[in-house]
């Protein structure tokens, strides 16, 4: 029997350690949480993507009474960016959550769901460019250098050949 050990390198930063670009992206995701539509979960999520041309696009979770018809913030931002700027690689993505009845972001990070990870991976592969991921909580910010590192055993376009 052969054993594989899969590891993910995550850099844990205090907010004051973030560079200007990362802080700007995280702040855009925080601001986006206030436009979330989350009347059922009361859990607002904001995502911000930075494109290769330095444009920042934001998205929020959009819930619907007919579960699972809603959409996560990450996919809202990525799909908009990819449809409106199809020639611009996504270079970074920040994700933030907060309780809808609070003005403060959640203490802990909000990791992306499996569907969002798959879309993040596809976006990274589509452009052939790494997408840095910032998972932001009030305590600290986790930074992963590539979206593919969040989904080590992934289903990609090569599987369809």
Question: What name fits each language-model region?
Answer:
Residues 38-41:
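Short loop/turn motifs at secondary-structure junctions and domain boundaries
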Residues 58-159:
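Zn2+-dependent cytidine deaminase-like catalytic core
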Residues 1-27, 101-103:
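Short, compositionally biased leader-like segments
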Residues 44-51:
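Short beta-strand scaffold segments in enzyme catalytic cores
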Residues 27-34:
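Short Pro/Gly-enriched beta-strand edge/turn motifs at strand-loop
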Residues 11-13, 34, 129, 149:
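Histidine (H) residue identity feature
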């Amino acid at each position: 029997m052969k054993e594989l050990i899969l590891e993910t390198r995550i850099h844990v930063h205090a907010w004051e350690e973030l560079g200007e670009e990362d802080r700007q992206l995280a702040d855009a995701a925080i601001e986006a949480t206030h436009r979330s539509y989350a009347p059922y979960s009361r859990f607002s999520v904001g995502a911000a993507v930075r494109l290769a041309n330095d444009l920042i696009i934001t998205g929020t979770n959009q819930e619907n009474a007919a579960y699972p018809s809603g959409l996560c913030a990450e996919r809202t931002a990525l799909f908009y960016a990819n449809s409106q700027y199809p020639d611009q690689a996504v270079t970074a993505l920040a994700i933030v959550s907060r309780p809808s009845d609070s003005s403060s972001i959640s203490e802990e990070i909000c990791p992306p769901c499996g569907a969002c990870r798959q879309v993040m991976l596809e976006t990274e592969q589509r452009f052939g460019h790494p997408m840095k991921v910032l998972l932001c909580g009030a305590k600290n910010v986790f930074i992963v250098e590539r979206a593919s590192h969040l989904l080590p055993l992934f289903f990609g376009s090569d599987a369809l050949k």
